[in-house]
Amino acid sequence: MDWILPIAGIIAAIAFLILCIGIVAVLNSVKKNLDYVAKTLDGVEGQVQGITRETTDLLHKVNRLTEDIQGKVDRLNSVVDAVKGIGDSVQTLNSSVDRVTNSITHNISQNEDKISQVVQWSNVAMEIADKWQNRHYRRGSANYKANNVATDANHSYTSRVDK
């Protein structure tokens, strides 16, 4: 049985050697994977730096656009305020026109009889003025014709006598 112990030692040494070879193989495989991961991370790092630069540029552009839009909004606010003021003025004007219209309508309805009398009197006055003008015109026309007839008669008589 003495020989079992050295054989067991040899078997244990061989097993340990196989175990070490397996561990070395696994470690080599892990090393290859880690090298691949390192290369991939280097590529990703470069891409991330590129993305970071582009993102920074985009943020600067967005900030400039935001400032531009803010300036335009501020200018537009003054326009909106002006339009609101115009709207308020138009509304006030409409209210004033409504009040004046209502006042006129109310006054007309209260003074309807007086207005009717004024219209009747103005019609009478216009008729009198027309009759006065017609009468004056007829008188002027009659005198004109009478004077012309006498003048024409004298002129005709004297012209015949002189000849």
Swiss-Prot record:
It is a single-pass membrane protein. The keyword Thylakoid does not apply. Keywords: Cell membrane, Membrane, Transmembrane, Transmembrane helix. One of its GO terms (cellular component) is plasma membrane. Pfam families: DUF948. Its main location: membrane. It is found in: Cell membrane. The keyword tRNA-binding does not apply. It comes from the Bacteria. The chain crosses the membrane at residues 7-27. Belongs to the UPF0478 family. PANTHER family: UPF0478 PROTEIN YTXG. This is UPF0478 protein SAOUHSC_01855.
